[in-house]
């Protein structure tokens, strides 16, 4: 559901997956549905309701980011397994309702969070789970996506582009939470009031009357550690846009900048330092690291779309995916493969409803703290998924 510039990246991945029998598309704008139907030679519907009436058992939601919750809820209520782009929803009540529907129906819900497959998150998780980090102390992650780097279509949608940054928190949150295996329990956050001379973050323009373009938070985790999460849309940076800049335990730590990944460990009176860049960076990036303009090109998002990194287990993907395009640090293929396997085998997906809520709700609550000038607020939790 949703025939736009983002969903086009995923339709072929569904079409080629060995567990998928057929694919159809839908959009509430009939012309878009017809265009995609003809482009991919599949059935198409000119409304979400008509799609839900069809003989299908799974729905993928690729509507605008602030609209996902109601679509997911309706699909679950109609007995469909559901995949949605991020975020899960923009209201805590919708997140809770999705979790309760999954509990009640036994259906599969997966949020398509790219960043749990990002090499920096996978590396921190690997070292933390091995015990080499010790107890988790502190981590930093951010999603820095300046609106000047958005597509023209998004820049021109003034009602939607001014969404509060913390309503799109899952990239930054998921990277550190997936690595620690913990969840956020309390948040204090502050925002930057936009002063640029354009109508994006202005009252009376966007749907939220939002004037905050950048937001910054500290969150307490259930394991006792603290994380700093930034969501910025007016920021002098481009790439990487989603990354862990620091991740520390009592015994070891990880640091990152541009294309350099450093792992340190306490050893007696000093530390050992290991440059793990060749293990964590995409293979195409490493192959070009001796170029004179290498850092400049990394800062402009080169080699960060479809090239796998050695740490990513790309050999487990279906052979049918070998010649297909990838995206977002080579995460797209993992996302669709994981959902299709979960729906086919009726098992918990990687980012199930409970985990999706833990990646989403802290951001929604953080914005409430922003509006209250940094007042600490407890973060509600939807609990753990059932043991399979």
Q: Where does each model-flagged region fall?
A:
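N-terminal Rossmann-like dinucleotide-binding module
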Residues: 1-40
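Short acidic low-complexity segments
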Residues: 43-54
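Hydrophobic residues in well-ordered beta-strands that form the structural core
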Residues: 46, 84, 109-111, 140, ...
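Beta-strand-loop-alpha-helix segment that lines the small-molecule cofactor/substrate pocket
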Residues: 57-58, 64-65, 69-116, 131
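C-terminal capping/lid region of NAD(P)-dependent oxidoreductase domains
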Residues: 107, 134-138, 368-388
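Predominantly a Rossmann-like dinucleotide-binding segment in NAD(P)-dependent oxidoreductases
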Residues: 108, 115-210, 215
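C-terminal glycine/acidic-rich active-site capping loop/insertion
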Residues: 114, 200-201, 207-208, 220-221, ...
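Glycine-rich, aromatic-lined ligand/substrate-binding cores of catalytic
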Residues: 178-199, 204-268
